[in-house]
Structures are given as structure tokens and as C-alpha cells.
Amino acid sequence: MKNLPSKALSVAVSLALAAALPVVSEAQSAATKHQQAVLVTGASSGIGRKITERLAADGYFVYATARKDDDLKALGAIKNVQAVRLDVTKPQDIDAAVQTIKSGGRGLYGLVNNAGIGSDASVAEMKLEEFDLMMAVNMYGPYRMTQAFEPLIVEAKGRITNIGSISGILASPGLSAYAMSKHAIEAFTDSLAQELAPLGATANVVEPGNYNTDIVKNEIERGVAPPGTSADLSMDKPPDEVADAVEKALFEPNPKRRYLVVPIQRQAEKTIRKQIEQLVQLNEGQPYTYDHDALIKMLDEALSTARPRTK
């Protein structure tokens, strides 16, 4: 065999090595060059807008959804944000969003099911059409979005964060439909987390109190806000703490199943007390009632297995 000139030999070796390496698609290449991507629904205002701004500012890439042209334009002007037109009640919008994200080549690490609407009517007063719309947005919306995007989340070993509410725990008159929809998110998240765990993915729920958002303002004006709501301290606070909780739920190493985040201590106390009251009611009067000592032992065991607080 003839000796090849050194330049030709170098080229031959390079070609041989290139042939031995796996082919990297354009999508794979793009995914390695960009930040982790998160999809946030209902990003035009309130909690969704704050989540979008926080994640984008911290270097994550955010697909932020909205329905109106002006909102899409405003979201698209934020660095690290791509605005996506999406109405969670429209399957065709969801399908189009899936294709948009797939074609982006970044994959999808996180899904934040935030889109929601409020109500201010009792069961007797609420029209069935209003009830149907609320369930379509608040309950069916997260379900549809999760079905559509779960394959991408599982592929990335990522996380799904649902935005619940303390109204899912602290029901009050005039909020029956809203409380129902948010309580459904609690159960949905618990089941979803168990389904995702064997696949290496995670689901959790962030439960905000009454921050300065349009939904809470409307509840206060109508006099149907959950117990513990006031027009003073809580209304002075924008939902920055909610964005903090969502970022932790998405990215901290050992995420919790639930993140309670409220603007004032009174709301935290009422929420925890309500859970304790429900525990007492469940335990009382059934064939396998636990006594005081047994309940305290259960509480101690639960506290001992809880995550240590980070300073």
C-alpha cells in the first residue's frame, strides 16, 4: 500500500472519524445549545405573566401562551420568551402549540398549567353555560394540556406544575364552582404524580393565596373571597412569591408535591387549620378511629420524613 501524503492522511482520518460518530439531527443540535424550555399557559397577566417574567429573567426559555394579539405582542418582546397563541379550550390550538414546540428543537422540560378564570355566583345563581366554561378552562384545560405535552415532558425527565388555589381547600359561599375546579386540580396532581414517577418525571401543585390579581380583586369587590382575605396587606402584594414557588417546583433538586404560598400569615393558618379539621372529621365516628396518641404519632412520623428546611 502506498504511503499517503500527510495532508491526505489527515483528511482520510477525519472522514473516518466523522463516519463513526452518530448523526445529530438539527433538532438535537438546537436542544443542546439552548436553555431548558418551559410552557406557561395564561401568561398574559397576573400570576402567569409574573411566572413568565421570572423564568425568562433567570435564563430559562419560556413558551408563553395568550389569546389576544396585544398580549402576544407584549410577551414576544420579553427576552427568552416566545409567545404562542393558545386557548386551552380549543384542541386545535393545543395541537398547533405541540407542533410549534417540537419544531423549535429545544424540547420541553416544564409545563405550567396556569390558565384559569374566576366566578362570583352561588350554585343557585350560576348559569350552566358559565359553569361549563369554568370547568373547560380550569379543569379540562390542564387535563388536555397534560395529555398533549406529557410525551415531551417524559422525554426530558421534566416536571408538570399545576396552579391550584387555597380556594381548593378553603371553600366559601359564592365560589362553589371555582373551588370545585381547584379541588379537582389537587386530586389530578396526586394521581398524575404517581403515573409520572416510574417514567422519571414529576408533577406538583402550587397553591396561591389571595395576591394582587384580577381574579382576587373581583372576588373582593363581590364579597365572595375565601376566608382570610382582606383588602389591605394581601392586595398590596403582587404575586412574586408565587413565581418563586413555581420556579422551585420546576427546578429544585427534591421538589415537594405541594407548595402553599400566601401573602399573609392568617391565610396560612386558616388553610392548615382547615386541613386539620378535615382530618378530625374523617377520623371521627368510623369503625377504625385512631385515638389522640395514634394521631400524634402519625403527625410526628410525617414531620420526620418531611424535607429539611433550607436556609
Feature annotation, model-predicted:
Residues 170, 191-202:
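Active-site-adjacent segment of SDR/Rossmann-fold oxidoreductases
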Residues 165:
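Residue(s) in the substrate-gating loop at a strand-loop-helix junction
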Residues 146, 181:
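Active-site helix of classical SDR
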Residues 122-123, 130-132, 157:
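Substrate-binding pocket helix/loop in short-chain dehydrogenase/reductase
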Residues 198-260:
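SDR active-site lid
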Residues 44-45:
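Conserved glycine-rich cofactor-binding loop
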Residues 86-96, 128:
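The beta1-alpha1 cofactor-binding region of Rossmann-like NAD(H)/NADP(H)-dependent oxidoreductases
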